Regions:
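C-terminal domain-boundary segment and adjacent tail
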Residues: 16, 55-66, 144, 155-158, ...
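Surface-exposed loop and adjacent secondary-structure segments within mature catalytic domains
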Residues: 79-82, 136-190
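Alpha-helical scaffold elements lining the catalytic groove of polysaccharide deacetylases
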Residues: 97-116, 187-209
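CE4/NodB-like, metal-dependent polysaccharide N-deacetylase domain
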Residues: 107-138, 145, 205-220
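Terminal accessory/targeting
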Residues: 1-49, 189-244, 248-254, 259
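Terminal accessory/anchoring regions of large secretory-pathway or extracellular enzymes
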Residues: 3-6, 10-12, 43, 47, ...
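N-terminal catalytic cores of secreted or lumenal carbohydrate-active enzymes
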Residues: 3-108, 116-118, 145-149, 168, ...
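Conserved, mostly hydrophobic/aromatic
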Residues: 17, 113, 143, 254, ...
């Protein structure tokens, strides 16, 4: 009977922990200085033998890297405690966001986080997410790929969806993990009173609330808070808990052991599917996706640079005999991880902290661009050719590509033609040309004075658009600039209002918007590219409209137009000035004393089905939001957008809007959503997609929910504010922290694209079009007159590489999307990661490596799944068929000669 009573008692698992924001309203420097004090106290407490058994260091491996960099003498102490599973770290490197950073960034964060934790002795196999603002629908699959079966979190689930704390979470692909919610947050047990009378009432209240939500006898009671010191007398307090409350059992524990216990006692759990984004009981800040648009844009650009260009080029370079710079790439990623932490990428920081974020982006970009340039140069310098003006063109997608691409070049004065390696003349136009003779030639160094080097009399830095015929899959080709022949590069400029290519005809309407005609179907889309400006009374966490708003539309605004037309592209430039309120006070009075100058460039490239947009804004006003609207004419109940490693359909209206105020939700449920690169509306026979290089935020608006609103930017003046229309009650963050930098005053530039199609979504190839849009062909100019201090001098190399090269390719009928191609972390092979981008149909691919190779399925942590596709073959390997939102990773290992 005694045993039965024990088994019926509530078992309270007291989890000592910290939630350590590496930066927020304070800087990383302050955080790291105080981290040293904190970790020393934790190590001492765990070692003193007074019942302090476990401590959770926020599941962030970066914290120990930070600590041991300054306290290397404690590394062995840490290894001992981590190996004994008493100091719990991992699986993350930093506590990352899951909605606005890329899928690859999340995967690398987990990979390097677990690698770091294992370096110290043990990586916690729990998806521990105490504070991220919502949970991506693809995380169950990602967790399972890393061998993580348990998920412990706070934000995103409300009692109207699941009244209990335990459930099974099913991801978009069908993967499941066992989930436990901390219903009242990670800080719930952070303030324990020590006076006996107060403590007894406290336990009855706090633990009683947890019991009401628990579906087993186990409850999770976290003792910790933001950057709070360890509660040194916690073992003594737990002994007191047991004395004061004999009806319950109190034990100190850590997440892994807790989850193993509670899972054994769990039966018939409900299954929750998809994103966890409910804000009834806790805030998820669902419009933080556009906070500090300037920083979000930098993050996106660098993620694309690393994954879409840098890692593939480094892999090509490695296959050609050059060393793969693993540690440089890791350092770039770790800079991004610091910025991927939920507050950092959220932008909900002080201005000082956000300047640190911006500097890390600068560092990451500088390193990435320079290591990319070095390896393109290593390859180009060994290609068999003797031309003065040879350009190597790199294709980092697994199929041949052609079309118009932009190239940067240093050119002498004079006319020229461009030819490919077959001697075929290529069409081109020069779009920009600036003389830099003194700068370039003044840096030249003659390493070999005996060698005759052509030095032009004048040098111009130029941008060109060149129509390439074919660039090999995952490889390179060359094009030659021939100055002995004459080419016509002129573009005709006029005050016209119309441009076109094979697919579209675009004209400026009388009201200043665009009329787009799809030449294939003859369908006309009127009132496109409408700019909408309105007030933002929110803060760094949430967009919120003012109580008295004024919305300004570009419709009816005077527009000046210029067209530029060449053989390879046509461009339409529009200038306008919106009359807008200067600030929220003027907006509430419906005043419009300020101007918001806009310049929009709309371009069509020969043979391309994309309409490209670039918008320059001179932001002179405060606390507002600017969006660009595309009226699709497709009444939609669902929007379609990409998510990490797949696609997701979301409702365009929410029933919860009717009850949120009555039920006192912490935030208004809204349909402002996140994407990775595109959003689309489709009625089964036609569709429209908007692709972005910048802010990954959209909303579907209009009476028929037929208009895609792409957020360009939003601005605000305080880190936190109280009593917002969309977020009533207390301020998030700190309301006294002013953020004038977040007003984003000055010049801003945004780029995005439009894709119109007469087909269902799956048939339109939107994911591939977006991937190509975000993966431009890359070029390198090898010219002796550039060899010098300008780019660091290079010696002459033996020319042994062919002018055309392909390392790896997918067959023509392959329909997966390449997510990553890189050197494996700890083997001689290459990682190929793909996913199914479709709503309904399955996807597959046939991969062929350039040599005989071994093809093996591996998990996201690059461990073998025990399934070899092909052991040794020159014909490649057929991948298994992938269902909706499934990802697949293949290790391709070349045979040693």
């Amino acid at each position: 009977m005694e045993g039965e009573r024990d088994m019926s008692r509530t078992k309270v698992h007291v989890i000592p922990h910290t939630h350590w924001d590496r930066e927020w309203y304070f800087t990383t420097s302050r955080s790291k200085v105080y981290l040293v004090k904190h970790v020393k106290e934790v190590l001492d407490a765990l070692e003193n033998g007074d019942g302090f058994k476990y401590y959770l260091l926020d599941a962030q491996g970066s914290l120990l890297d930070d600590y041991t960099r300054w306290c290397p003498e404690d590394e062995e102490r840490i290894r001992r405690l981590v190996s004994d599973k008493r100091l719990m770290i991992g699986p993350w490197y930093t506590q990352t966001d899951q909605l606005v950073i890329s899928g690859e960034s999340m995967v690398r964060n987990l990979y390097y986080g677990m690698e770091t934790a294992q370096k110290y002795g043990h990586a916690m196999k729990v998806g521990y997410v105490p504070d991220a603002f919502g949970q991506s629908a693809q995380m169950p699959q990602i967790y399972q790929e890393f061998g993580i079966r348990h998920f412990l979190f706070w934000r995103g689930v409300a009692d109207n969806t699941n009244p209990k704390t335990e459930f099974l979470w099913k991801g978009s692909d069908g993967s499941q993990v066992f989930a436990v919610q901390m219903p009242f947050g990670y800080y719930y047990g952070g303030n324990i009173p020590e006076e006996a009378g107060e403590l007894e009432a406290y336990l009855d209240s706090q633990i009683g609330a947890l019991e009401e939500k628990a579906s087993t006898r186990h409850v999770y009671f976290p003792n910790g808070f933001d950057q709070a010191p360890i509660r040194l007398n916690l073992p003594e307090l737990i002994r007191t808990f047991n004395e004061l409350d004999p009806e319950r059992e109190y034990v100190m524990n850590e997440p892994e052991r807790f989850l193993e216990e509670i899972e054994k006692d769990s039966n018939d759990l409900p299954v929750l599917e998809g994103e966890l984004m409910e804000a009834k009981h806790m805030r998820i800040h669902k419009s933080i996706f556009s906070t500090r648009a300037d920083l979000k844009q930098q993050n996106n650009e660098i993620e694309h640079l690393i994954v879409n260009t840098l890692e593939p080029v480094l892999s090509i370079s490695h296959a050609l005999g050059h060393e793969y710079p693993h540690y440089i790439v890791k350092d770039i990623w770790k800079l991004l991880f610091e910025n991927a932490a939920h507050d950092s990428i959220g932008g909900c920081n002080s201005d000082t902290t956000n300047r640190d974020v911006a500097f890390r982006y600068k560092q990451a970009r500088d390193i990435a661009e320079n290591v990319l340039e070095l390896h393109k140069r290593l390859i180009a310098s060994k290609i068999k050719q003797e031309e003065t003006f040879a350009f190597t063109i790199f294709n980092t997608l697994p199929y041949p590509r052609k079309g118009v691409t932009e190239i940067d070049a240093y050119l002498p004065e004079g006319s020229f033609v461009i030819r490919d390696t077959n001697g075929q003349q290529l069409l081109y136009t020069i779009t920009e040309k600036v003389e830099q003779t003194d700068y370039v030639l003044g840096q030249h160094i003659d390493l070999n004075p005996s060698k005759k080097v052509y030095l032009p009399e004048r040098v111009f830095r130029a941008k060109l658009l060149v129509e390439l015929q074919e660039v090999p899959a995952m490889g390179y080709t060359q094009i030659i600039f021939d100055f002995s022949a004459t080419g016509d590069t002129t573009a005709e400029r006029s005050n016209g209002k119309h441009i076109e290519n094979e697919f579209y005809s675009i004209a400026v309407q009388e009201n200043g918007a665009l009329s787009i005609t799809d030449k294939i179907s003859g369908r006309v889309y009127s009132d496109q590219m409408v700019f909408e400006e309105n007030g933002d009374d929110g803060d760094s966490y949430n967009y919120s409209p003012p109580e008295r708003d004024l919305t300004v539309s570009s419709l009816g605004t005077d527009v000046e137009t210029i067209t530029s037309k060449s053989t390879v592209s046509e461009e339409l430039s529009l200038r306008m000035k919106l009359k807008v309120p200067y600030d929220l006070n003027e907006r509430s009075a419906a005043g419009t004393s300020a101007e918001l100058p806009l310049q929009a460039s709309v371009s069509l490239r020969k043979g391309e089905r994309l309409i490209r947009f670039s918008v320059d804004v001179d932001n002179r006003v405060l606390s507002h939001r600017l969006r660009v609207l595309f009226d699709t004419g497709i009444a939609s109940k669902l929007s379609i957008a990409d998510q990490p490693f797949g696609v997701i359909a979301r409702p365009t209206t929410l029933e919860e809007v009717k009850v949120w105020e009555r039920e006192q939700w912490t935030e208004k449920p809204i349909t402002i959503e996140a994407m990775q690169s595109y959003v689309a509306l489709n009625d089964g026979s036609r569709g429209v997609a908007v692709m972005t290089e910048g802010v990954r935020e959209y909303e579907v608006i209009g009476h028929e929910h037929d208009t895609i609103a792409l957020t360009l930017f939003r601005t605000f003046g305080y880190m936190g504010k109280e009593n917002l229309l969309y977020r009533p009650g207390r301020a998030s963050g700190e309301k006294i922290v002013e953020t004038p930098d977040a007003q984003l005053l000055g010049e801003l530039t945004f780029t995005f694209a439009l894709h119109v199609h007469e087909s269902g979504f799956d048939e339109a190839g939107i994911a591939q079009a977006a991937k190509e849009y975000l993966t431009p062909l890359s070029s390198y100019q090898l010219s002796d007159f550039l060899n010098g201090r300008l780019i660091f001098a290079f010696r002459d190399e033996e020319r042994i590489f062919e002018q055309n090269y392909s390392l790896l390719s997918f067959s023509k009928d392959s329909n997966v999307i390449l997510s990553a191609f890189k050197k494996a972390e700890h083997s001689d092979g290459y990682i190929v990661r793909v996913f199914n981008p479709y709503l309904e149909k399955n996807a597959t691919a046939h991969i062929t490596y350039s040599e005989s190779a071994h093809y093996e399925l591996v998990s996201l942590d690059e461990r073998s799944k025990g399934e070899t596709l092909v052991s040794s073959d020159t014909e490649g390997a057929q991948l298994p068929e992938l269902q909706h939102c499934k990802l697949l990773t293949v290790l391709v290992t070349p045979e040693l000669n």
